[in-house]
Amino acid sequence: MRNRDFAETRTPLGVIGGLIGLVVASAAAATLVVVGITPAIATVGIAASGTIGMFENLPGYLAIGELSQKSNIYATRSDGSTALLASFYDQNRVEVGWDAINQYVKDATVAGEDPRYYEHGGIDLQGTVRAALTTATGGRTQGGSSIAQQYVKNVLVQECEREAGPLALEKLTEDERAALTPDTRFAIVEEAELACYDTATEVAIDRKLREMRLAIGVEKRYTKDEILLGYLNIAGFGGTVYGIEAAANYYYSTTAANLTLAQAASLMAIVNNPVKFQLDRPDSETNGAANGYADNTARRDYILTSMLEQKKVTQAEFDEAIATPVQPVITEPSTGCQTAAGSAYFCDYVKNILQTDPIFGEDEQERMLNFRRGGYEVYTTLDLDLQNAAEA
């Protein structure tokens, strides 16, 4: 992970938890297969034992790469301070450290997504078995994923965006690559990313087993707080909004450090189902301004109730938050050189260099992706005060 607020170590208790998690996951793996694909009682024993062996042979190490982050172009002022000209991104994310996130957010995440997070070794057997049985017996499809499992899935999706396209291009011959047009190159990359995404998120037993195995590996290598921080920085909050800092900026015009209890619970409600719970569709009939964002409010209140039950908030804090209406204050993020006003031409000039100079990538596609995902911080020589005076 990019943020290094924590050492990549586990406490003895955490290591023991990881080992227990491996045993628990093996049992859960057998349960998943038994309820999912083995209806005949006579074959249950064989299926269960075979699944445990297969599970324990799955890879248990997950390489965590850099997160996709927006790139910014800055100008300067006469006093030496900087001013943002424009931002560019595929994912609107601002990665932050542990101390930059309000404790309400951390507690709301655990309460809403994984109440036994600090007790298990990466897999919540109770939640996993409940979800598997409910889904297999025809009930509403349920997730049952721990925070570590959700983090793993998000990391795998990020890998798809970062690596699937380049790997697909590498499989082509030199002549095939030379013959590519920008449109065909883009189509190949997009197809590879979508196929990788489908594999990383498909509702399938083998995918779930791999996710569980990797979650245990992550728990062995990182602390609980480190995993939670990684999750809060990588999670999707609807549309192109990723990570708790960008979500706080976008939905409530504040920072992750300054969120209120009600706001924190409202934001963490979104990650459960961004399409259903996001707060930027005021005209929605089910979750809009007219009904007080009813879907988000219901999920928020569930999280608040869980926080109260876990003694993470006082009764007074709970009462105040539960009585607070969900009222988003949307701040649209600036993107593209059109936001640079009179300096747009200079912004375009800088952007053109970043997308054409070979130092920023081997080809046009790579340079474009690096620019939109690489988190560039570009400080230019443009003096805004002199520029404004010249235009006056």
Identify what each model region corresponds to.
Residues G97-Q150, Y242-Y252, L259:
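Flexible, acidic/glycine-enriched loop-and-adjacent beta/alpha segments
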Residues T76-D79, D90-R93, I101-Y104, G112-P115, ...:
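Solvent-exposed coil/turn segments that connect beta secondary-structure elements
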Residues G53-G60, Y89-W98, G112, M212:
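N-terminal post-signal-peptidase region of extra-cytosolic proteins
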Residues G45-L58, G121-R140, P166, D198, ...:
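Alpha-helical membrane-targeting segments
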Residues D79-R93, G127-T134, E366-M368:
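N-terminal periplasmic "start-of-domain" segments of outer-membrane beta-barrel proteins
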Residues G144-E391:
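Non-catalytic, structured segments within soluble enzyme domains
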Residues R2-T76, A83:
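N-terminal type II signal-anchor transmembrane helix
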Residues K70-T76, A86-S87, E95-G97, A108-A111, ...:
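Soluble periplasmic/extracytoplasmic beta-strand elements of cell-envelope proteins
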